[in-house]
Amino acid sequence: MKLIIAEKNDAARQIAERLTTGKPKKDKVYNTAIYRFEWKGEECVTIGLAGHILAPDFCDSVLFDKKLGWYSVTEDGEMLPADIPDGLARPPYDTKRKPFLADGISIKGWKLESLPYLTWAPVIKLPAEKELIRSLKNLAKKSDSVIIATDFDREGELIGSDALNKVREVAPDLPVARAQYSSFTKAEITQAFDNLVSLDQNLADAGESRQHIDLIWGAVLTRYLTLAKFGGFGNVRSAGRVQTPTLALVVERERERMAFVPEDYWQIRGMGAAQGAAEDDRFKIAHKTARFTDKDAAETAYGHVDGATTATVAAVTKRSRKQQPPTPFATTSLQAAAAAEGISPARTMRIAESLYMAGLISYPRVDNTVYPATLDLGAVVSDLAKINPALAPVCKKVLAGPMKPTRGKVETTDHPPIYPTGEGDPSTLDGGQRKLYDLVARRFLATLMGPATIENTKLELDVNGEPFVASGDVLVTPGFREAYPYGLKRDEQMPPLEQGDTVDVFDIKLEAKQTEPPARYSQGKLVQEMEKRGLGTKSTRASIIERLYAVRYLKNDPVEPSQLGIAIIDALTQFAPRITSPDMTSELDGDMTRVERGEDTEEHVVTHSRALLAGVLDELLKHTQELGDAISDAVTADARVGACPKCGKDLVMKTSAKTRGSFIGCMGWPDCDVTYPVPSGVKVSPLEGEAAVCPECGAPRIKCQPFRQKAFEICVNPTCPTNYEPDLKVGECKVCAEAGRHGDLIAHKSEKSGKRFIRCTNYDDCGVSYPLPARGKLEATGETCPECGAPIVVVNTARGPWRICVNMDCPTKEKKPARGRKTTTKASTAKKTTAAKKTTAAKKTAAKKTTAKKSTAKKAAADK
């Protein structure tokens, strides 16, 4: 039996489906899905891993023996030498407090004193997927050969190498081969398995070097920043060798913006049109002096044209220019283009991975921008036309013309640029997937098409002796723009005018303006800047940016640093500037590239990185108090939402020690007891300027961002008139009417929780109450539900009016569930509750077993 090891379950299934002539049989080994099939008359089985099956970590301590020197001991009793420098103190120690032990140092707990030892502690690999490893070994015992078919890059080669090491524990003599492919098309997979190669151990070692270096740097720096401020693990402050200089780029740009001194300038602009033309045919005109830096000169010129109604055409100039088609997509350029379409780099990679696994696009983590000669471009275009009717006309033109693909600056031999495979069914894709797939498909076609021709018409006008200009671009020859309209400006057609013609002018105004500071990075631009500075890799840049958002060092898009992010970079720049510079990170990445090429060893590169980190840590430990104070001030600044209306001190976001829920409290506590509730399930941020203070009650106003919903602004004071909704009668109580009494159904809003509901005025007698959606203006209709007799109301939301029966147990809910709600019977709810409890208990047990041997150091590693 031939054992084929893929990186994920979907990949295992795809490979089995592509290689077999029939349909693979899905089976299980223990609880792991596998796929059995025949290939070239031989029984085969594919198994998909879950990414890395081994995770790097540290032992609990480093110990010292006079004969053996420094070492660590694994759970299996294996002794690993630790290259602790002679300058660090050895036992016996003068103190018995943690982290000091009788025979060494504990590195399991988070203590500043242990960090110099942690820097040099040996790295071990623990099972991250025990069930998968068990299944893998079971299959290996029954196999006569192994094929590694993980992704062909550093991470994929390392995953394959780790899996192979586990296989060799039970079958050390199995022949091993490697399948390298760039897409899940039948032709590509078949070719890869017909032309097997050897596992590239240098590539795997380079991947492991990065893995170990990022663990060591992330663990040491994260623990240091956390301990400098908090003295414990509860409020982790993340850092890493790539993450920190990336944050420094954003902070550096913000400092440039803060230091920017705006300069005044003036512009004279208006509108023009051919005489008698419709209002829609007007065009923009501006004084030939685009910016007046002298106010008097601007006012003098404006005085000449103020009130002018006509102008004379002094000259008409037409010029054509060619716009060249774009180069093929690499990972960074795809992320930048997708960001311009509103898809973040991290989401782009998640979607691209799903499209790749579905066989719709080629491998998405690439640097290459040159199509290889082996790629049949014409065949891809033909296949694309068959599965994508909307692109069929463009595909036909591409096939009819000379196909000369563009070339980028980077050419590699591992994978081709990102392109659509021409297989699969794009019509089944959801919104985000379809958007990204179209971007890839259209970019691919654009790289095979000719340039676009744009004609510019420039008008020079005389307005009462003052020179004005107008300009417009028109797409004359679409070229590649027929396939790739992204970023194309709307045509600005100038009227057919000649020298000496008279045009009408309107609304000429003098505008005072100021120069703008450098723009903040968009996420797409930040990815490009990281690539330019040598920060991260094509596979890690998006996740690094996502991590910086997750730990609240960054906010918004365009990217803005938080006060905490600024404080950390300012402090690190002052006390350990090398860590914030891209140079050291770029140097380490260069070392890993040399390992990949076989020019250096993993051991040497990791040791070199430890030495660099030791120097950084030595400087930081001298300034722990100053750095901790800076972080503390920044944390308070980020948590501030406004001034307390009672005592004037800061109101800040706080977390309840009992409930772990968020609330707003005064920094003057316990002398000032002002607190405000915070809506649940939202991300809160302060407002700026006049909007930051409520005009009605003087309390702060905040911005609330629900998950995947439109943000809203509220006053934090729940009793404020701006939050108050007058009671609204929506109907009469049916239960009370049947009991011979009158009861009104009134819509209320709870001052304490902010929740809305409908309740009968005789609630104590009838118990009638209905929940309402949290947001949306409520309107009574005076109608009742024909099924249950409850009131019908209209809730006006951002997506339009929503007409509902307020009774959540109404039979109409069974027919057509209300948007965003799901009605269940008490019996089904009880079943689900019981099942949920069992599932939760099982998950907790599994989680405990899986993580029992993992230390908190792994959680601390910031960079991937």
Where are these regions (language model features)?
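Long, highly charged, low-complexity internal segments
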Residues: 39-47, 51-125, 234-353, 357, ...
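Amphipathic alpha-helical transducer elements in NTP-driven molecular machines
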Residues: 9-16, 43, 98, 104, ...
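Short glycine-centered, acidic/aromatic-flanked micro-motifs in structured strand/loop junctions
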Residues: 150-152, 336-338, 365
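Intrinsically disordered, low-complexity regulatory segments
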Residues: 1-217, 506
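Short, charge-patterned binding micro-sites
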Residues: 185-187, 362, 368
